Regions:
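Non-catalytic accessory segments flanking enzymatic or RNA/DNA-binding domains
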Residues: 1-151
Length: 151
């Protein structure tokens, strides 16, 4: 196989309810590119990759997911322009299951790789969860209590 690249599943503790599904010739380079942004509190992590022979094979996967449930994809409008993103409201396990099914059906499960988090990445995931819990306890719960007590 003359490998062209991979379809990847990326996660980010900053928004754990989404995964990013895309294509890259070199997933480590793509990861560095995404993580150069100062706009996201935590870095992206590679959850899984699937080796493909054709570039932009992820577009076919995006189309499949959109057909199954068009509400999963992150789509918004900024300055009158529609932005269709590679982010999907699903768990990393659900995204992996889709890739795994495709790999099995194609007889290419050996091209599928589940990546391990480093200890530092695990700590970041835990920290992000703690921050989310603290935000919920400090802001959301008191706000809901206040709303309920309002005459």
């Amino acid at each position: 196989m003359a490998q062209k690249g991979v379809i990847y599943i990326l996660t980010n503790p900053s928004f754990p309810q989404y995964v990013k599904i895309g294509y890259a010739d070199n997933v480590e380079s793509r990861l560095k590119q995404l993580n150069n942004s100062e706009c996201i509190p935590f870095a992206f992590r590679i959850y899984a990759t699937y080796e493909v022979e054709e570039r932009l094979t992820d577009l076919k996967l995006h189309a499949l997911i959109d057909q199954l449930n068009p509400n999963l994809r992150s789509i918004d409008e900024v300055d009158g322009k529609k932005r269709v993103r590679e982010f999907y409201a699903m768990s990393k396990e659900q995204a992996y299951s889709i890739l795994e099914t495709i790999a099995i059906l194609g007889g290419r499960k050996n091209r599928l790789k589940l990546w391990e988090l480093s200890e530092e990445q695990r700590k970041d995931v835990e920290l992000a969860a703690e921050i989310e819990d603290e935000h919920h306890e400090r802001i959301i719960i008191p706000f809901i209590t206040w709303i309920k007590s309002y005459p």
